[in-house]
Amino acid sequence: MKGHYSDLWHRIALAAPDRPAIVTVGESTLTNAEFDAAAARFAALLVEHGVGRDDKVSILLHNRPEWLVAFAGCLRIGAVPVPLNFRYRAGEIAALLDDSDSVVLVYGASLAEVVADAVAQVGRPLTLLQVQDVAAPLLPGALDFAEHAVREPLPHADAVDGEFFIYTGGTTGAPKAAMWGVQQMLSMQVYSLYLSAGLPLPESADDVVRMATDPDSAPIVALALSPYMHGTALTTVINALLLGGSVVVLPTARFDARAAVRAIVDEHVTRVAVAGDAIAIPLVEAADELGIAELPELRAMLSAGMRFSDSTKERLHSLAPNLVITDILASTEGGAVGLGITRSVADLPSRFRMTPGTVVLDDALEEVQDTPGAVGKIAFTGGMPRGYYKDPEKTAANFVELRGKRHIIPGDLVRVEEDGFVELLGRGATVVNSGGEKIYPAEVEEALLQFPGIDDAAVFGIPDPRWGEVVAAIVATARPEKLDVAALAEHVGTRLAGYKKPRRVLVVKDLERSPTGKIDLAVVRERTAKEGVTP
């Protein structure tokens, strides 16, 4: 089915104007009509400031209604929403503002200090729209985001296909902007979206609106506990709106597991997006602390790109007897290449089944997905981004034409099992995946080497029961006994996002590199886990 999120949301708002669209717990509710009008007013504000089709609008916010209003408003005029990581430091934000050619930055007042520094580093004019998530003065030259509320809504016009960017986590260098077509994303989502809701596949926009406004349909209430800048969280909430459901937003910026459990109960949440164990474990523990024995209304939980252990899934199935957990093997650049679906404890241990369009390639780039025991890189031939923005070389390297089909090869190594299942072996690189955030070792090493007295450094991940992996480092200095490891970690934290700071550090006099400059990573990782210190 062809369609555009903007058009469909507008039609749903006309057909069911009074249904809740976005509920901020304990604060406010936007109905479908109010959300539609807010998006139209924000679109008018953008146009007033010279923003048009294909112009880039960066969004640097925690999960808030304004995030979704900005996203929807961009789609209405063909502007390109560019979600940014609110954990980034000024230099990282400036680099992405520059890389994306953003002309507008929507940001939270709580992030104003880092934004001011980032904008100064960009060194070119940007339209700044400040969301008052905390009481704070506007940055010089900034506009209050709430000003859009006094604009006349931009009249609706049928949307023409546009784009939105999702930045990679930087597994092979600096983050890259994957350019997703809006209509392409919708067509990719339709199959899993409607089947997971127990609905027939729509053949037309009329079908979408009819099912979204059917009074007899089971209500869809979605809560994303991972940030909207991540693909799984974003698609969870925008697809809930497409089904005629509502999105629940927590009022606090920081993840609060107890508040999340209370919201699931009080707001009758039916589906939740998480980042594996990093969020799911505190969620289960919070339910225990609150004396909540069962979450019967919770029917779906989705997670992607993060360790999600069977022991955690077992606890979740016991807590939520009607829950279907979908563990998604995916990358920013491609669709879901594998799904680990469990409906009860009986389905454990969970296994990844390859999705249609997924293949496994050996070193010669030949397909081996039909050969049990074969090891290779998993690849996807279905819907995928148009490429990386302004990076034709990396686009050509990662989006490969093979046997007449375009393939995205994200680099994950798998072992082929029987009946279409695969076992994930690793990322095929030294990237650290911590809580769903990908951390490129080179940038952390660079920060470590800027600390006085550090002669050499290597960064890698070590296993962690909650986050999957945490950043660890081995550093060389002439006098190991004199090194202040806590100060070293804080030094990194002043230059990079907090989650990139080393959580385990081994201090030595020499890294004992080989003549070619390499270290035995397996040995170093084991030594650091056993002998390293926690800052």
Model-assigned labels for residue ranges:
Residues 366-400, 437-439:
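Conserved ATP/PPi-binding loop(s) of AMP-dependent carboxylate-activating enzymes
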